[in-house]
Amino acid sequence: MFNWAKQQLANVAGTQEPIYGPSAIKSVAIEAEKTPYTEVTRDGLKWKAMDSTSVETESFYITADNGYIALAQVIYSNVAGIRTTCQFNCKVFDKDPTKPHLWASTPLNNQDFNEDKTSFYADDCAVELSEDGTYYTIKSMNSQDAIVNLKITRSTPGFQAGTTGTTLYGTDHNNPWGSIRHAFWPRCVSEGTITTKEGPIDLKGKALFVYALQGMKPHHAAGRWNFVNFQGPTYSAIMMEFTSTPSYGSTLVNVGGIVKDGEIIHAGAMSTATHTQVKKDSENEWPEPSEVKYTWSGATKDAKPVEASIEGPLGERVDRVDVMAEVPGFVKTIVAAAAGTKPYIYQYHPKLSLKLKIGDEEIVEEGVMFTEATFIS
């Protein structure tokens, strides 16, 4: 009975894959060797709304001037071409660390797009890109716990690593069976509010926007992730790293960039994420990071070398997200047993310093870093 259930699960969720090896993945870093990054235009921010298994997200990470940290996110997912589901997520970390964070996750109904697929709509929800491609408005009244009314305006060009921002999966790279793409607005101005039952929270400050598409089953795409969003008074540093599953040789892909208002200083696929100290989580055995070192290296447009790093203690985690917590118990047991997955996301937002060297110029700037370490398999 269990083997039958396992097979049925594999058919839909894809819990087992053979070992294809590293030749079956084409990292975006290969493109980035010739073209470190390309600027992302309005055309590069269209929803794909794939009709095969995929997860597509638009995520807005806000670092408010008043100390709040917030996330607003739309998730569009397709399971095996059978069912499409959409979700609006909102999370707010209180500036008082002793207070619980707010989390609202609401299924969306009647999802649709505008004609060129740059804006997303559902009942009581709209995430719209402006005609000139310089700002998003995010409005949601799906949860009375978190009524969202935000405007996110980019203050520097958007970018993607390489020419496409995409890593391909498959034994034939011309006809891949999967992909992961990321595009970023690394430094934005945020304004507006998230209104809770206690009243409105002013989210004037800085923001990062991330567009992501996993054009395959997420737990086939990557086993681990590191995500960094550093926002300082003058500079922003961002990073997205994933490690493919052993099926694809546990290949490491890391994209990131350093920017300031109006200028991409450096972007590409030569950044690194290291957990310099870890402690075993007593509940699930994952090596939870306690100290980190993140580095960026490359060159400016005029060929000045760029080196940057952020390192230090993460402090107490602000959350540990059990990714499968909302999955029904029976299904969760099967998935965990069949796939060997117990996915958790560890979240932190310490104040740390960005050390930046551009040519002979050395800069040190303190800022707020929101960072995640995700363990899937």
UniProtKB/Swiss-Prot annotation:
Coiled coil residues, start to end: none
Keyword Endoplasmic reticulum: yes
Protein name: Ceramide-binding protein SVF1
Membrane-spanning ranges: none
InterPro entries: Ceramide-binding_SVF1, Svf1-like_C, Svf1-like_N
Main subcellular location: Golgi
Membrane topology: Peripheral membrane protein
Annotated stretches, region: Peripherally associates with membranes: 1-18
Alphabetized Pfam families for the sequence: Svf1 (PF08622), Svf1_C (PF17187)
Gene name of the record: SVF1
